Every structure is written in structure tokens, then in C-alpha cells.
Amino acid sequence: MTPIWKPIAAAAALTALAACATTQRIDAAGDVHALLIAIRDDDHAAFDAHVDRQALEQELETRILDRTQARGTNDVVQALGAALAQPFSHLAGEALIRPQVFRAVAEFYGYRPQTAIPNQLEIAGALKALPDGRVCAAKKRQGPCLITFANEAGVWRLVSFDGDVSLLRLPS
């Protein structure tokens, strides 16, 4: 390849890569929109269709293990953490992975019941494409991911809640 073509080829490759990321975010945004509607309407079937419960429970288990197995933690706490992380994460998942719990999280971030749910293009603009093919949403454009979605058999499903776990509370 001659030196003149190298910058042109690089620009073309970057353009193609950006187009893929945009298509990915637009595709994901349709399912994210459906999840937001399910949360707002307390639609358990639609919510479950857009949530990977097993992945979220695994994440809870990992967080429990990270805390209980941390350096300096006493042996009793480590043993209890190792023995109870999986059953506790399953129980917590049953209680917390529900539309009304995620509605409380949405309200914390400013989405009230009377707030219009953004359309697919607005959601796509708020999503960040991740190097591993997933997408995530952050409170601020350059901020950390709060929730992450993965394409599972053609449906973008919530696979990770990266925000503060203390926000996941049963409604009172």
C-alpha cells in the first residue's frame, strides 16, 4: 500500500467501526426502551424478557464473595461468604429483580412516573458501545456504566447493574 492510501484506509476503517457501534446502540435501544416501558407499567412478562436474571444473580454472588473474601476479613466471615453467597444471591435476586425495584432506581436517577420515556434514538444516543459487544447506560455521557446490556439470541437484555447496590430496595 502506498503512503498516500494509508491514511485513507485508516479513515475508512474508523468510519466503518463507528457505523457498527452506532447500529449496535440503535438496535439495543429498542429493547432498552421496551424494558423502560415494562418497568413503568409493572409488566413482569416484558420485564423478564429483557432481563437476564441468571447473570444478575451471578453478579450479586460475585459482589458478596468480593466483600467476604477481601484481604483482612476474618475466617468465619470468609467461610460464611463462601457457603452462603450463591443461595443468598438467589434469594436476593428473587426479591430485587422486579420492575418495582428498578422503578425506584429509575426515580433516583430522575425518571419519575410522569417523565416521558425517551424514544429509541434518544436512548441510542445515551448508550455507550463497549469493546466486548455489550452496551451500557451511564448517568452522564462520560460517566461510569450504571446498567449493561448484552445481545442474547437477538434480544438485548439487562445483564449487569453496575450502580450502587444499595439503590436496589423493595418499595415501601
Predicted regions and their residues:
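Bacterial N-terminal signal peptides that target proteins for export
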Residues: 1-9
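C-terminal motif of bacterial Sec signal peptides marking the signal peptidase cleavage site
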Residues: 16-19
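Bacterial signal peptide processing site
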Residues: 21-24
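Post-signal peptide N-terminal segment of mature Sec-exported envelope proteins
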Residues: 28-49
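Short solvent-exposed beta->alpha transition segments
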Residues: 51-128
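Exposed beta-sheet edge and beta->alpha loop/turn motif
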Residues: 93-172
